């Protein structure tokens, strides 16, 4: 979560020395009589199953923020703030050991607050570590900030983003490190306007007139938050601390919908408010390194609380009726998590062992009410529901890794999770209970040879639990005759993932991957006898995806960098649900991508970048998608020894980023076109202050379930 404003921190009253480290000669770029001497150091390498991107060795990283710079890591693509990894599903982030448990928008703001100049390296972990909760085909991106000597440092960043409306964003951070304590504070505030349009056509196979609807939504979101850390060091090998994280959202959405039913039309207006939407995370931790071999223990407690109230009003006018139809919904949802974790590292001569155990208690309480009425109805129709859901997860894990000699390295891991769930629908008086346990093995084997490159083969098993809002059975209306609801009977989905990858030959990266799942969650739309459309999730899909991704990067003349890549994959989806007309789909597809970076001046401080990606038609979860393109340009300028950075960026200037899809049901076909209005022009400015040689102040919170609340 990114964070608002820069606030001064109280200084610890402990003596400290100013011991600035001096970079080695190969780390420095020297200007002597206008002759620039640049030493080439490895920018990317693959080691122990990880792709490692050394940011400090990359001259093209100047002025980039923490999200844009991810696009420079092989296999990672960044588009309009969305990060994806070829062959993978969920993307999780670790910053200096902190597993970031944020929703997509808050995570994007957190990354934007990072500067390339403050990042030491970025690691891509395709095989999820056993110490973290089992997830579906997950990939972890670990960012390590520069960790040097004592002192104070900070940064501020601001941007203006012109899309349909002007958007503003501001953030800042400050940290202070002494011999006895660490302190840090991040803060941010944003004021965003978004517009999107969604056109849907239902073509019925029985000759009934098509149903065509067009929906426009304009939303305004104000978001702010902060993250604070305090750590006290009893000794170099023992410390205790606390982390506080708070996020505030206020969202107002106004929508219009026009629907042609073939014989009559309807017009709807809606307004939805969600405010204040608050989330608080508190973490207490104790770290102790003991023994002659560097054995360590970490104890962590997490508390998470999210409060999400919503109010929605919908008014609909039908051309064949003189009455207005209104729907009013009010809801309050509270999430409370408690978790305790103990992690141990035992570096023996014969293997590096990691082991631990965890317990998580999840409580979700929702109260919802719905009122619908026509103008001349004396008594409106009222419905209400109270849904309470609890989930308790006990877990234990162990991993062992070691060098096997002759360039080989191996790692095996095993995690066990046992889960108890209970759901209560008080309006119906029903109680659903379930319990299940599962083992999640993982294995990783790599081989490195300097002149040949690095090969890595891995296998892992993961599990995707339903999002908490997917379990809530209450109906949320978007128009007077269309709603979405959850399904309290959803079960978790088990995923099997395997891949072989290679890096070498001066910048070639390639990966062959596969992932398959049974009883995956899919969404099904249905019409009732009155023509009302419902959308609900079900465990109804069997999916498989296998593909080959290749990426190559090369620098010419020391100033011009080119990157080209492509992906070819085969997807398979199958369902036994009779709602679908086509219950099995198999298809080949792929993408091509090319990007360039050019240094435009002698000091190498002015960099022009361009990026283009073309996606070919593909199918996913029995839905056919048409091709589309992504295109963006940027110009970055660094001043004051890289402390001041200016950026000008243009995204989707030709309006190519639109999603078109088709679904085949037994009785009808759905054609959909979604335009998120991603075109914008952005001007950003960042400034770093304080000493350059300062510790990064972070510590892992290890809270890993709050992502399921949004």
Describe the residue ranges of each PLM region.
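Outer-membrane beta-barrel signature, preferentially recognizing the C-terminal barrel domain
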Residues: 387-389, 463-512, 516-518, 534-546, ...
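Short acidic/polar hinge/loop motifs at secondary-structure boundaries
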Residues: 66, 72, 99-126
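Short strand-turn segments of transmembrane beta-barrel domains in outer membranes
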Residues: 56-57, 150-174
